[in-house]
Amino acid sequence: RKMKVILINGSPKEKGCTYTALREIEKQLQKNNIETEIFWLGNKPISGCIGCGSCLKTGECFMQDKVNEFLEKVPKTDGFIFGSPVHFAATSGMLSSFMDRVFYGRRKLFSNKLGSAVVSCRRGGATAALDEINKYFGISNMPIVSSQYWNMVHGNNPEEVLKDEEGMQTMRTLGNNMAWLLKSIEAGKKAGIK
């Protein structure tokens, strides 16, 4: 089986700034023979977790939306990159609700799978939003993949993001780092390391 990474676009804009950053990462992963998928959350509301615990019993959320569609893909995926625009120094409400529900009852699915956060912002609040996403990985036994700088791009539209040379280089490095770590883990498994 070919290794796979899902890049989650947590922006209500399908092809905006967050997508532009994720697409740059995706290109590097594909150059490294990693299968990819950009999973867009869409532009319809995603309800927050109500803590009912039904997912612990059934394996899926009772709310039938993008959460269950995504959870079906998790077992056959090796790494995840969650991307979000910065809204008031935080992730988009949509991504926050999505991640709460994804990780609430199904955290064990992510154990030892790679995780990384990416944010796009016009000016500020990026590191706070990155920290928010990374907390899900830290509590789920997920190694976090980093880059040469914080995983952020700056711009108010995709054209401005493409002009953020340092940000785009950070995305390329992140893609290469994710591919390298996936290949290292695969080599370790082949050598008998469990």
Model-identified regions with their sequence ranges:
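Helix-loop-strand module that forms the ligand-binding subsite of alpha/beta enzymes
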Residues: 58-149
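N-terminal beta1-alpha1 ligand-phosphate binding loop
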Residues: 4-32
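A structural preference for short, hydrophobic beta-strand core positions in alpha/beta folds
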Residues: 37-40, 146
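Glycine-rich phosphate/pyrophosphate-binding loop and the adjoining helix
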Residues: 26, 31, 69, 143-194
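N-terminal beta-loop-helix "entrance" segment that forms/cooperates
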Residues: 41-61, 156-161
